[in-house]
């Protein structure tokens, strides 16, 4: 089935809707139309939809199972993780092979040598992915007199294209200033003269720079000329080749709602595979478990109180 919003003429949702029977209500029941769906439209990323639906078209076994597989998010998760891991390994190897980069980033997150490089690359990619979700909300590149939500939803790639046109380093000229001088620095009305638009101030720590004392001055090691020289535009071309192929959705999948794309929960799964949680004494809690906790904990609290619980 196809669903659309009359106020949004550019996008629509292609959903797999199944019919069952509700014996309690004694009537037919239909699945949530948002469950197992592709978001398509003029500016949508269609690579995943095209590949998975084409696979179903080509198969000789036309059945409900193969149709459900075409609308499954699992292949996207595995494919994205494999490509994301490839980006991580390539950048880590490139930086680790450079002795100056090893020295500059030594001490990153309290780590040394290659472990420090790995931590830097994880955070670099994590920051970029986070900004993909942020730009999807229209919070980047917002015109000066417009509200948040009206920004450029392709802000990062647009900026990267600008760096290529000007033949300048994307990392040095745009990405580092975006990280450390815009997102991590408060400006009047959030306006950035470099980007000629509003950029939100985020003080959660994700965009804090790794610094060292050099000749009595605090220097940002992440924007060091040595790191800027190693990370050239070809590295970011590879990153955007991957990220621009997928639909980033700001809605997390739930047991009843699975949009075929990259969502915050999937990002958690990616980091779970890349990061050694045991050594860091951390744990990624999956969305379905959070849903259960949100239901069970209030019920338990009410049960223990003097007031009897109500449904």
Predicted regions and their residues:
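Preference for the N-terminal adenyl/adenosyl cofactor-binding alpha/beta module
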Residues: 1-311
